[in-house]
């Protein structure tokens, strides 16, 4: 895929209704794959998928082998925008997180996700966890902002609001 195409690798199947494929790519443990480096001790994003070769215990060409490189770091954007679902609008009155869109997604073998986004208005928090046969979702938005929450609830028996401000439109629930 290369440095230029990697930022589209997970968003493309997600936008085409194939989010399970995106989650499978995220969770791929072999080389190439984001988890390959994690399984082999990485705490940063490597420049190359094969910066370290587990089978031989050797490192790739050190002249082009950064162990702290953003190239494949675009995965972070997909995790925030898709798994946590934190997004801002594209119109001028929505920009800068004045209007927030929360559209979390769960899939693959992930059992929870949790993250925050600092904005000019304050902190946005989004988290979900699979518990028994349910998914528990929590979100926090800053004062003086509005949020549109879309939960992937099709096929589920109910959506229950346990606390928080008014939910004004529950169509499609």
Where is each model-derived feature located?
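Non-catalytic C-terminal accessory modules of carbohydrate-active enzymes
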Residues: 20-173
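Conserved small-residue packing positions in alpha-helical repeats and bundles
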Residues: 9-10
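Generic helix N-cap/helix-start motif at coil->alpha-helix transitions
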Residues: 1-6
